[in-house]
Regions:
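A Lys-centered signature of the CheY-like receiver
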Residues: 108
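Acidic, metal-coordinating helix/loop segments flanking the phosphotransfer/catalytic sites
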Residues: 36-54
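Non-catalytic signal-transmission and effector/linker regions of two-component phosphorelay proteins
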Residues: 1-11, 17-21, 35, 44-45, ...
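As written
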Residues: 52, 66, 96-105
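Charged docking surfaces used in two-component/phosphorelay signaling
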Residues: 21-29
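Hydrophobic/aromatic residues positioned on beta-strands within the core alpha/beta folds
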Residues: 85-86
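Acidic catalytic/metal-coordinating carboxylates
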Residues: 38-39, 65-68
Length: 124
């Protein structure tokens, strides 16, 4: 169930422009605030605030990858609930991602409902 007044902002990081726009739109239409970034470095340059409630994070990014970004945030004391999205095969990422305790791992192409359900769980 979507909150009428979401508790904060969803941070989205994906290097695919069209996917980033589509996912941002889906999140906004569901009633959530969202900030979207094309790279981990762009998110880190802005910084994470108390207003940010979860990450939707591509695993395979140029430069700093999604798993490295999650570890960097953990090391700085920012343990945001994370939903990983990826085009990689499950066998390539299941073990390493499990260690980061994500709310969900969604394999591209994923269903909008699965994404929004995961965001709801992250914000609960």
């Amino acid at each position: 169930m979507r909150a009428e007044n979401p508790p904060g902002r969803v941070l989205l990081v994906d290097d695919d422009d069209s996917l980033r726009r589509a996912v941002s739109r889906t999140i906004r239409l569901a009633g959530f605030a969202v900030d979207a970034f094309s790279s981990a470095e762009a998110l880190l340059a802005q910084g994470v605030t108390e207003r940010d409630v979860c990450l939707v994070l591509d695993v395979d990014l140029p430069g700093m990858g999604g798993m490295e970004l999650k570890r960097t945030l953990l090391d700085s004391g920012r343990d945001l609930p994370t939903i990983f999205i990826t085009a990689l095969e499950p066998s390539q990422v299941s073990g390493p991602l499990a260690a980061l305790a994500p709310i969900a791992v969604l394999f591209k192409p994923f269903d909008k409902k699965d994404l929004l359900d995961a965001i709801d769980r992250a914000c609960a």
